């Protein structure tokens, strides 16, 4: 913080806060605000959507969007809370991916589980690479602040995990 003193009839102190202090305030607000309950149920929401007939990639994306909807509905001025919500949803979905791969390895032929594992790995890697690309472009060329960019990246990562989980779940049903 920078303190600037001005002499007048009464002493005035102007405090200019740096972005780090603003981030600290946002984190403090997050600490007293609960993560949206539905973010904790991202996997359940996605499973419910996937239990319906899914025929296209667009329908998969709709299911993933429904799973992370509580995070999407966070106001624009709550970027830190939204980013945390997306990270929690991603964590739930990543746990589902791990469990799904364990189930697949236990129930499918080695060739099938190896094929699905390789496809899944590259689905995730290509998605995360696009998230990094979008972040780098936003930092270099946009007027968004750091928190908004982190929110976008967290959303992208949660969507990547959601799509990977959805594809794995559907592949598991085929075998």
Q: What does each model-identified segment do?
A:
Residues 38-175:
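N-terminal alpha-helical modules
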Residues 14-24:
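Bacterial N-terminal signal peptides that target proteins for export
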Residues 33-34:
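N-terminal signal peptide c-region/cleavage motif recognized by signal peptidases
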Residues 1-16:
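N-terminal amphipathic/basic-hydrophobic helices that include classical n-h-c signal peptides
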């Amino acid at each position: 913080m920078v303190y600037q003193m001005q002499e007048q009839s009464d002493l005035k102190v102007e405090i200019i806060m740096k972005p780090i202090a603003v981030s600290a305030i946002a984190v403090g607000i997050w600490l007293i605000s609960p993560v949206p309950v539905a973010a904790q149920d991202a996997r359940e929401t996605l499973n419910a959507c996937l239990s319906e007939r899914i025929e296209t990639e667009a329908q998969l994306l709709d299911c993933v969007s429904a799973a992370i909807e509580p995070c999407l509905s966070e106001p624009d001025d709550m970027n830190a809370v939204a980013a945390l919500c997306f990270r929690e949803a991603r964590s739930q979905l990543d746990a589902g991916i791990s469990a799904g791969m364990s189930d697949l390895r236990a129930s499918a032929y080695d060739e099938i589980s190896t094929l699905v594992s390789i496809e899944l790995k590259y689905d995730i890697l290509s998605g995360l690479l696009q998230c990094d690309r979008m972040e780098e472009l936003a930092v270099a060329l946009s007027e968004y602040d750091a928190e908004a960019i982190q929110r976008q990246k967290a959303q992208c990562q949660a969507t990547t995990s959601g799509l990977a989980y959805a594809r794995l779940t559907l592949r598991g049903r085929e075998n």
